[in-house]
Amino acid sequence: MNSRRRPVKKDSEALEISIPFDETPHLDPQIFYSLSPSRGNFEEPSEAASPTAALMNGVRAQLHLALERNSWLQKRIEDLEEERDFLRCQLDKFISSARLDADDHCRGKPGPRRAEGDGRGGTGGEASDPESAASSLSGASEEGSTVERKRQKQKGGPGRRRFGKPKARERQRVKDADGVLCRYKKILGTFQKLKSMSRAFEHHRVDRNTVALTTPIAELLIVAPEKLAEVGEFDPSKERLLEYSRRCFLALDEETLKKVQALKKSKLLLPITYRFKR
């Protein structure tokens, strides 16, 4: 050990003190460990932040899907409610027509009883007066024939009127674009008066889906007739009316669709959804 001795004088006495210069001081290594920053402390926030961002992205995606599904379900509910109202109107109309037929049938039943009563009166008068008996018998026979005719009419006539004519009206189909436009305008006028789509379709005896399938033709002719040149005229020998309606639907651009939606909100067009998809 290298050390230097320095004499120190105190009270006329010399003292020797040894001071080591070459020795390194002994320090506890735990002190340096406690002062040095930990790497894990800086890495933990980044690791914790990445799962949070992934979780937020997943929640946003699920929320977006839920909103789209909600809007789709809302449209579906509106369509089902309109179809329900239409079916209710059809059912009420059928019940009322059945009641009217039942009332007519009940009114026609007392006829034969009156005829039988007249016949009995005629037979009673026959014993007293032959001429009155003959006249009563002839009147009874005429009345019986009229009652029989009424029965035949009730059996055949009302049934044909109730089931035949409405079916014939329902089966009437338009054959060209002009017919589609004419029918659309009639239903639109009725809708503006009655304020109900179902009642308007019932009034004209037209199915809602049938009108929805041909609506693009009428809307194109009303809102953007200049686009008819792009679509072309309808030729029944080359395509069906449904295919022509689809081509008209594809010809409606974004600007035209915005005009159509604005007119539907103001009740200047039928607020009916399309049956085609792009």
Swiss-Prot record:
InterPro entries the UniProt entry points to: CCDC106
Biased composition (Basic residues): 150-166
Record-listed Phosphoserine modification sites: 128
Chain location of the short sequence motif Bipartite nuclear localization signal per the record: 151-164
Keyword annotations: Coiled coil, Nucleus, Phosphoprotein
Biased composition (Basic and acidic residues): 102-119
Domain of life: Eukaryota
Tagged with keyword Acetylation: no
Low complexity compositional bias, start-end: 131-144
Chain segments carrying region Disordered: 102-174
Gene Ontology CC entries for this record: cytosol; nucleoplasm
Coiled-coil positions: 61-99
UniProt subcellular location: Nucleus
Main localization of the protein described in the UniProt heading: nucleus
Function of the molecule: Promotes the degradation of p53/TP53 protein and inhibits its transactivity.
Subunit structure: Interacts with p53/TP53.
Protein name (database record): Coiled-coil domain-containing protein 106
